Amino acid sequence: SDIVLTVDSSLDLDSLSPVSQSTLSMVLRELANNVIKHSQADSCQIRLRRDHGIVLEFEDDGCGFEEVTGQELHSIRERLSLVDGDLEILSQSHPTIIRVYMKEGGKA
């Protein structure tokens, strides 16, 4: 899969707690797998920043979701619930934009 990836990060990843690093890694891995397997995207952008916690925005120019039912990305939502995090689908297609928020450190 030839997807052009752009990363824009103002986070010092080494300064994050082990729980935050692990959760962020799992979320990124799952989102990347979904893009590769399902999206038919040509490009993907990842933005990481702090805004009263850790914010990850994941955007691709693929086919998106046919219908948003609330059950999409269930494993990510489940993992984020353990660290008081949340996931929001800002745009379901053209581009697909997903925003993930989690408190720094988490509670796990």
Predicted regions and their residues:
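Short beta-strand/loop element within the Bergerat-fold HATPase_c
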Residues: 43-53
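ATP phosphate-binding glycine-rich loop and adjacent ATP-lid/helix-beta elements
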Residues: 68-99
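Conserved ATP-binding N-box helix of the HATPase_c
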Residues: 21-43
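Conserved short strand/loop->alpha-helix "switch" segment adjacent to the catalytic nucleotide/phosphoryl-transfer site
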Residues: 6-29
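Glycine-rich G1-box
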Residues: 63-64
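Short beta-strand element(s) in the Bergerat
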Residues: 20, 52-56, 96
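C-terminal beta-strand of the catalytic ATP-binding
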Residues: 99-106
